[in-house]
From Swiss-Prot:
Organism: Escherichia coli (strain K12)
TM helices/strands, residue ranges: none
Gene name, Swiss-Prot/TrEMBL: kduI
Name of a matching Pfam family: KduI
Superkingdom of the organism of origin: Bacteria
Protein name listed in UniProt: 4-deoxy-L-threo-5-hexosulose-uronate ketol-isomerase
C-alpha cells in the first residue's frame, strides 16, 4: 500500500515537477495478477487497479494492520468499473459478470471479493475507488444502459463530452462514494473547462483510452496558482478540495472520476471563470 499524506495548498505551489508527481500522480494502476493500492489521507480514499490474468486476485487480510480492520471492506464501500475485457467479481460467493464498462458497487461488510478475467488474452481491468462507509447498502451491478448520461460542451470550444454517472444517488445509494466515466467526442481535447473546485469533496481522475504517443496535461492547483502534471495512459491523479481539476490532451481520451466527501450533490461546486485563471 502506497500512503499519500494530505498537503496544504501553500506547500503544493512550491513543488517542482517531480515533487508534484510524487504527491498527486498514481503512475502505475494495473499490474498483472496483482492489485495496486494508493491510500490518500485526503478523505481517506483508496484508489487502485486489479488485472487478473493467470489467476484470481483478491485483497486479503494483509491490509488489515494498515486499515485497522480484520478484512478490507469491514468499514468501507467499494466502486469498480471494468475498462478491459469481460471478467467476474465474486462477492461472498455471489458471482457477478462484469463486462467492458460495466461497474459493480460493493457495500460495507463484504468479507470476500474475488476478481477474475474470463479470457486471459483480453484480461479485465478493474479500476476501483474505495471510501469509508457508515452503513451497508446492497451490492449492485450497473451497466452502461443504466447510467445517467449528460452531454456537455461544444466542438467549437473543443470540450464536447458525455458524462456517464454510474454511482450517483439517481442510480443507486452509497454512503459517500460517487463515480462516473466521461468520454470526449472525437477531435475534442478539453475536460472540465471552464473549471471548478468543490470544498466539500475531493476527486480522483483516472485517464485511459490514450495512445502511446498521446498525453494529457492535467491542470491542478488553486485557480490563481495553477500547475500541471503530464498524464499518460492508465494513470490516475489525486485532486484535493482546494484544487481545480481539468485537462487538455493531444488527442481525445476517456477518464473515470471518483469523489468522496461531505455530500453527493453533483452540482455543488464553485465555478471559476477562464479569465480568472492564472
Amino acid at each position: 500500500m502506497d500512503v499519500r499524506q494530505s498537503i496544504h495548498s501553500a506547500h503544493a505551489k512550491t513543488l517542482d515537477t517531480q515533487g508534484l508527481r510524487n504527491e498527486f500522480l498514481v503512475e502505475k494502476v494495473f499490474v498483472a495478477d496483482e492489485y495496486t493500492m494508493v491510500y490518500s489521507h485526503i478523505d481517506r480514499i483508496i484508489v487502485g487497479g486489479i488485472m487478473p490474468i493467470t489467476k484470481t486476485v483478491s485483497v486479503g487480510g494483509e491490509v488489515g494492520k494498515q486499515l485497522g480492520v480484520s478484512y478490507f471492506l469491514e468499514r468501507r464501500e467499494l466502486g469498480v468499473i471494468n475498462i478491459g475485457g469481460a471478467g467476474t467479481i465474486t462477492v461472498d460467493g455471489q458471482c457477478y459478470e462484469i463486462g467492458h464498462r460495466d461497474a459493480l458497487y460493493v457495500g460495507k461488510g463484504a468479507k470476500e471479493v474475488v476478481f477474475a478475467s474470463i479470457d486471459t488474452g483480453t484480461p479485465a481491468k478493474f479500476y476501483y475507488n474505495c471510501a469509508p462507509a457508515h452503513t451497508t447498502y446492497p451490492t449492485k451491478k450497473v451497466t452502461p444502459d443504466e447510467v445517467s448520461p449528460v452531454t456537455l460542451g461544444d466542438n467549437l470550444t473543443s470540450n464536447r463530452r458525455t458524462i456517464n454517472k454510474y454511482f450517483v444517488p439517481d442510480v443507486l445509494e452509497t454512503c459517500q462514494l460517487s463515480m462516473g466515466l466521461t468520454e470526449l467526442a472525437p477531435g475534442n481535447l478539453w475536460n472540465t473547462m471552464p473549471c471548478h473546485t468543490h470544498e466539500r469533496r475531493m476527486e480522483v481522475y483516472f485517464y485511459f483510452n490514450m495512445d502511446d504517443d498521446a498525453c494529457v496535461f492535467h491542470m491542478m492547483g488553486q485557480p490563481q496558482e495553477t500547475r500541471h502534471i503530464v498524464m499518460h495512459n492508465e494513470q490516475a491523479v489525486i485532486s484535493p478540495s482546494w484544487s481545480i481539476h481539468s485537462g487538455v490532451g493531444t488527442k481525445a481520451y476517456t477518464f473515470i472520476w471518483g469523489m468522496v466527501g461531505e455530500n453527493q450533490v453533483f452540482d455543488d461546486m464553485d465555478h471559476v471563470a477562464v479569465k480568472d485563471l492564472r
